[in-house]
Amino acid sequence: MTLNHFYCSIEEEIRDLTIIGGGPTGIFAAFQCGMNNISCRIIESMPQLGGQLAALYPEKHIYDVAGFPEVPAAGLVDTLWKQAERHHPEIILNETVMRYHKRDNGMFEVSVSSGHTYVSRAVLIAAGLGAFTPRKLPQLENIEALEGKSIFYAVKNVADFTGKHVVIVGGGDSALDWSVGLLKSAASVTLVHRMHEFQGHGKTAHEVMEARDAGRLNVMLDTEVMGIDVENEELKAVHVQSKNGKTRTFPADRLLLLIGFKSNIGPLAEWGLEIVDNALVVDSHMKTSVDGLYAAGDIAYYTGKLKIIQTGLSDATMAVRHSLHYIKPGEKIKHTFSSVKMAKEKKKGMQNG
């Protein structure tokens, strides 16, 4: 995805909707703004759009998005952006939203880390899990010099592991996915999990055990990493110990720690909104307790919430739709099918051309 056509905001230029967060939910919200004929801006703290998919898992394959039997994370982000960019949303990158203020006239001011303030008629928070930092193994100390070289917390580039002896730690979806995903390119893969059973998707867990039974993958359950050997700032081996006290050492070039992330919603926690499970409580329209202020995706909490990409896209659709009542008060809200709207726009483009 190229970003060279994005432009910076004029501080007081009013948009209909400010979208906080440029992950899949935020990008799709921008598309929905275009479909509903309202202007928007996305404010994203990272240097690129895509959220965790772009920052942590660009080469991870996703299987549970409707219409995509299988799609790499970066490919999904590109497709979502291609869908949204036709409506020319304004994009603000490398800016963290710090606070908001609702004016007496109902307008929202959103202030960012650089000191700029952006104004809109409504706000949609699509900040995912907020700021996230990888969980580390406390028994591995002073490893900063190895991080990004021999020790990783995500797979951003498969080439980093090609031809290497890889030890993966974890039992969730990411650990299982990459245990299978790296088999074709790595010299060897060893999966170490401290529990007796995996917590990831059952289908992938079955694939992991099949690979183990076929002798393609080494799986160590009820086992923890206890230490590492390093020479000249390069990883050489990983030491593990099982619950029965048995110790083993594996030659290793790469240690991939996939044991989750700590999330922090940061300044949003100080906005006076109701928070449950580190997420903002919303109603059935994705509205918070403040009129005109919405939340969608992983940052939104409601009974029965499922934190997957698919529900985030649905949340965004409902939030944008309901925001029209606040952005265009008194106007009758009409639904236009996407096929009809796109046909009209194509016809208009041909006439203007």
Swiss-Prot record:
Superkingdom assignment: Bacteria
GO MF terms held by the record: ferredoxin-NADP+ reductase activity; flavin adenine dinucleotide binding; NADP binding
One Pfam family linked to the record: Pyr_redox_2
Named cofactor requirement(s): FAD
Keyword terms of this UniProt record: FAD, Flavoprotein, NADP, Oxidoreductase
Binding site for FAD: T25, E44, Q52, Y57, V97, F132, D298, S339
Enzyme Commission designation: 1.18.1.2
Manner of cofactor binding, per the entry note: Binds 1 FAD per subunit.
Protein family according to the UniProt entry: Belongs to the ferredoxin--NADP reductase type 2 family.
PANTHER family reported for this sequence: THIOREDOXIN REDUCTASE 1-RELATED-RELATED
Protein name: Ferredoxin--NADP reductase
Source species: Chlorobium chlorochromatii (strain CaD3)
